[in-house]
Amino acid sequence: MNIIPCSIKTLKGLYDISGVEVGQHFYWQIGGFQIHAQVLITSWVVITILLGSVIIAVRNPQTIPTDGQNFFEYVLEFIRDLSKTQIGEEYGPWVPFIGTMFLFIFVSNWSGALLPWKIIQLPHGELAAPTNDINTTVALALLTSAAYFYAGLSNKGLSYFEKYIKPTPILLPINILEDFTKPLSLSFRLFGNILADELVVVVLVSLVPLVVPIPVMFLGLFTSGIQALIFATLAAAYIGESMEGHH
């Protein structure tokens, strides 16, 4: 019978799938530092896409908005509503920060599924979505932490630190720990979801024909958008919380 050859082929296929490598990096040596080139290249591409789209859409504003201008006005209104809901009436100065976070993460996530990164060959590793790398997500989370510390200190001065002993000094260790868990949860949630989504697509493409993974890719686009929304919402909520001084 053909049972043994079929079993051997199945095991060989599983072995090939297990050979999918994660973690190879391409570095630039600048001075005495190693720069993670993959993340920089893909981040520059995402930034170029965002800037180019905005410039093309609003370079000649019309009283009656064109399709592109209308789209970006809708996006701006969405970000303003999100910021106002989470931060409150003093949301205005934070709209650019929240908008930048949301748009960069959104386009980065979608670029992993829509842009043919693998066409560009590197000496080591391969290009992928910027948010597929823990360095990017940690940097975004640390920026968010710096933003809500700045918001609290600029709004309340040194009395901002009184929140650590409210409502009782017993909660001091927990309140301090919370400042570490916030960026950790932000960074690992985003990194884990985007990495898992791309790995699932890679494995499915290795297992089955191209048509079958397409529904999973569409689901990945949806979840990628949701992750950008979650990150921006939490960032705005943390900023609003630090300005109001309650948990």
Curated annotation (Swiss-Prot):
- Going by the entry's taxonomy, the superkingdom of the source organism is recorded as Eukaryota
**Encoding gene per record:** atpI
Kindly give the SUPFAM superfamilies that the UniProt entry links to this protein. Answer: F1F0 ATP synthase subunit A (SSF81336)
Q: Which InterPro entries is this protein grouped with?
A: ATP_syn_F0_a_bact/chloroplast, ATP_synth_F0_asu, ATP_synth_F0_asu_AS, F0_ATP_A_sf
| Keyword terms, alphabetized | ATP synthesis, CF(0), Chloroplast, Hydrogen ion transport, Ion transport, Membrane, Plastid, Thylakoid, Transmembrane, Transmembrane helix, Transport
Localisation = Plastid, Chloroplast thylakoid membrane
Main location class: plastid
User: Which topology term describes how it sits in the membrane?
Assistant: Multi-pass membrane protein
Q: Name one GO molecular function term.
A: proton-transporting ATP synthase activity, rotational mechanism
Q: Please give the family membership noted in the entry.
A: Belongs to the ATPase A chain family.
Give the organism the record lists: Oryza nivara
- What name has this protein been given in UniProt? ATP synthase subunit a, chloroplastic
Family matches, as NCBIfam families:
ATP_synt_6_or_A (TIGR01131)
Subunit and interaction comment? F-type ATPases have 2 components, CF(1) - the catalytic core - and CF(0) - the membrane proton channel. CF(1) has five subunits: alpha(3), beta(3), gamma(1), delta(1), epsilon(1). CF(0) has four main subunits: a, b, b' and c.
Q: Which GO terms describe its cellular component?
A: chloroplast thylakoid membrane; plasma membrane; plastid; proton-transporting ATP synthase complex
**Annotated transmembrane regions:** 38-58, 95-115, 134-154, 199-219, 220-240
Q: Which Pfam families match?
A: ATP-synt_A
Function of the molecule? Key component of the proton channel; it plays a direct role in the translocation of protons across the membrane.
